[in-house]
Amino acid sequence: MGSFSIWHWLIVLLIVVLVFGTKKLRNLGSDLGGAVKGFREGVKSADEEEISAHNHTEARIIDADIKDKAQSKS
């Protein structure tokens, strides 16, 4: 009673097709696919922005006195 066999699922699918029709189900499937695609693109663009923010390095000024001291020690 806890699990359904393949026949139960086929009967449910047949009833759903009869109630909604194949055109509505096709439209629903394409809408769902478009939503998933949009979600993936949004996540991908957010990841790319985060990566580019981490790769950005700030310019540093090297003090000439420290550089001269390092050369005089060698």
From Swiss-Prot:
Organism, scientific name: Nitrosospira multiformis (strain ATCC 25196 / NCIMB 11849 / C 71)
Listed transmembrane segments: 1-21
Family affiliation: Belongs to the TatA/E family.
Subunit relationships: The Tat system comprises two distinct complexes: a TatABC complex, containing multiple copies of TatA, TatB and TatC subunits, and a separate TatA complex, containing only TatA subunits. Substrates initially bind to the TatABC complex, which probably triggers association of the separate TatA complex to form the active translocon.
GO biological-process terms attached to the record: protein transport by the Tat complex
InterPro entries: TatA/B/E, TatA/E
GO MF, one annotated term: protein transmembrane transporter activity
GO cellular component, one term: TAT protein transport complex
Function text: Part of the twin-arginine translocation (Tat) system that transports large folded proteins containing a characteristic twin-arginine motif in their signal peptide across membranes. TatA could form the protein-conducting channel of the Tat system.
Cross-referenced NCBIfam families: PRK02958.1, tatAE
Compartments, record wording: Cell inner membrane
Membrane topology (UniProt): Single-pass membrane protein
Domain of life assignment: Bacteria
This protein's name: Sec-independent protein translocase protein TatA
